Amino acid sequence: YILSPWQYSGMYQGLLSNMFLIQTRITWRDQSPASQDKTWKNEASDIWFATKTDEFLFKQHPVGVNTIEVPDVSENDSNLWIDIPKNLDEEGHYPRGLFTKILEASSFKLNWVLDPFMGIGDSGVACKQSGRRFIGFETNKDHLLLGMKRIDNS
């Protein structure tokens, strides 16, 4: 999964499609504080879901060429996510519910989750709270230390 503001979404689609199979682009309603745009208020960001093969995990069920069972995709499983509220008391950049929804769709408890651009640890906090193991990398030392503290305290 790659989270992206709309300005960079096309670039990520091009990069991902060179090495991965893009399964879907999720558009979610980003209810962050008002932007400084002089035109339309932007409330949408993209999440790119790509896999290395056509065989992957979705909603705790395998999907792919050698699977018999097809996962039940209900009305709630749309690629338009408008149901994730922004909690103003959270310390992170993204709502925790966003990561929780992704983790529940694509992993089991005790699975490892890798975030090579962990920032201040939003994905690590969600992993810890949902029973996943986490590995994160960050080049900014201040962000790394803040992220480690947030994950430890969650």
Question: Where are the language model's segments positioned?
Answer:
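Core catalytic lobe of class I
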Residues: 1-146
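Short, conserved SAM-binding/catalytic segment
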Residues: 148-154
